[in-house]
């Protein structure tokens, strides 16, 4: 299956989860094993050898764990605050109406492991910037960030580039 055919299975849901938002529903793509595999392989071809693929909760997990298997790499989750059982470090990021926080185990990236960070969407850049900060504080060497969608009009790429100018950002779809 061609990547464009796989991506065509993603449907737009207007006004979800609130008015003015165009939500990208990936469930039809995930339900089709050929399409899902095509997307995972497309991500994997963009990534050189790496120790760890790190995914951001929640939809980033769906892609990151599968990419990690494809690349014979470990998987590390960035979780919402309070969801990890061991000692963690956290980073806050801004939301439209307040703040949220993601965490990672304090030993997730020990010994300067090379890391690729994966999420479903790059919008404002807040969540990915928080993940990059945590990886940096943990001693990881971040090679790149990979997303399924990039919403270019929201400035996320620029936010990340300002704080992390040497981190490459790759997206399969840009709108």
Where are each of the predicted segments found?
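PRPP-associated nucleotide enzymes
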Residues: 1-175
């Amino acid at each position: 299956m061609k990547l464009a055919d796989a991506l065509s299975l993603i449907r737009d849901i207007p006004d979800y989860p609130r008015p003015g938002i165009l939500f990208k529903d990936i469930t039809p793509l995930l339900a089709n094993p050929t399409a899902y595999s095509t997307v995972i392989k497309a991500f994997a071809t963009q990534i050189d050898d790496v120790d760890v693929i790190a995914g951001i909760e929640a939809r980033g997990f769906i892609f990151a764990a599968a990419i990690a298997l494809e690349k014979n790499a470990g998987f590390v989750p960035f979780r919402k605050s309070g969801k990890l059982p061991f000692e963690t470090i956290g980073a806050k990021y801004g939301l439209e109406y307040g703040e949220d926080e993601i965490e990672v185990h304090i030993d997730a990236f020990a010994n300067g492991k090379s890391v690729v960070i994966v999420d479903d969407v790059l919008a404002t850049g807040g969540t990915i910037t928080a993940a990059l900060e945590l990886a940096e504080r943990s001693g990881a060497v971040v090679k790149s960030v990979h997303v399924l969608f990039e919403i270019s009009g929201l400035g996320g790429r620029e936010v990340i580039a300002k704080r992390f100018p040497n981190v490459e950002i790759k997206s399969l779809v840009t709108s």
